[in-house]
């Protein structure tokens, strides 16, 4: 998923709720975004997803997240 779209979904979920994305075949709420630099200087984009039933956070690669 593109970063801009994911950030828009995070904002929409924070203000209105009810937004879901899919990761590994499971529906999650978009919660936050994290940008890190790896030792080789490359950027790592991380999506932070919230599992609504278990109330836990899942950290995954942004490119593996799909719009639901």
Where are these regions (language model features)?
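Mixed-charge, Lys/Arg-enriched low-complexity segments
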Residues: 3-6, 63-68
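Mixed-charge, Lys/Arg-rich low-complexity intrinsically disordered regions
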Residues: 1-15
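Acidic, low-complexity, intrinsically disordered interaction modules
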Residues: 13-65
